[in-house]
Amino acid sequence: MTDQELLIYAAKAIDCTYDVEYGILFGFDRDGNAFGDVDWNPLENDGDAFRLAAELLLSIHQHRDCVIVDSVLPHPGLDPEKPWGDTCLQNCELSYRALVIRRTIVKVAAEIGRMM
């Protein structure tokens, strides 16, 4: 999937719509109020990635050479026996490790959204 597709499907996983042209996330909060989050990009923003993981109840496991992300709850299309992972070089810089974590969170969220 392209980065745009990852963002579109990740937004869908949290019942929102991602506007590719403007980089805005549109949706409704739990009280039914409409909102628009300017510059939503969990591929680049730690806070956006964290909120995405929190909304979907994703677990993040860091190891010396990889990052594993799986779901606490069952989601259609996600095999609970097969967590998603991405390789991180041993002793890699924090900025690279953060990039790998964000990208893996978005990949899992996008897969959830794609299966909805």
Give the label of every model feature segment.
Residues M1-M116:
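Glycine-rich anion-binding surface patch
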